Amino acid sequence: MLWQAYVDDHLMCDIEGHEGHRLTAAAIVGHDGSVWAQSATFPQFKPEEMNGIMTDFNEPGHLAPTGLHLGGTKYMVIQGEAGAVIRGKKGSGGITIKKTGQALVFGIYEEPVTPGQCNMVVERLGDYLLEQGL
């Protein structure tokens, strides 16, 4: 399966039981910052933003004082899973990032999508990729 199909079919799809509700943007990005696939709405990010995210996975808490930045948008870092998931909040929306062996799975949402729904969509694909050795 092509990486774009994972983004289109598993991240940017309707959320189970909530037809018409879907993530605002999504992507799969390699640990080196190379974009494997992304939605048309995924923000253009800077290398230093990706470096900060990777540092936080290796040194949990790194982003807490400054916030998580992606495409110039600042998210307040909220509870995640050290080394596995980073979650951020901004107003009525937020971001979930799941780390796999080779990639980062990003989901960005706005209401009416909830943080829990975003977490479910992103982490389900991330867990699947981990099971596949990716």
UniProtKB/Swiss-Prot annotation:
Post-translational modification: Phosphorylated by MAP kinases.
Cytoplasm in keyword set: yes
GO molecular function: actin monomer binding
Disulfide bond listed as a keyword: yes
Pfam families assigned: Profilin
GO annotation, cellular component aspect: cell cortex; cytoskeleton
Residues modified to Phosphothreonine: T114
Domain of life assignment: Eukaryota
Compartments (UniProt record): Cytoplasm, Cytoskeleton
Disulfide bond entries: C13-C118
SMART domains assigned to the protein according to its UniProt record, in alphabetical order: PROF
UniProt KW keywords: Actin-binding, Allergen, Cytoplasm, Cytoskeleton, Disulfide bond, Phosphoprotein
CDD domains for the chain: PROF
Residue interval(s) of motif Involved in PIP2 interaction: 84-100
Main location class: cytoplasm
InterPro entries in alphabetical order: PFN, PFN_euk, PFN_sf
Protein family: Belongs to the profilin family.
Additional observations: The variability of the residues taking part of IgE-binding epitopes might be responsible of the difference in cross-reactivity among olive pollen cultivars, and between distantly related pollen species, leading to a variable range of allergy reactions among atopic patients.
The name this protein goes by in its record: Profilin-2
Organism: Olea europaea
Lineage: Eukaryota, Viridiplantae, Streptophyta, Embryophyta, Tracheophyta
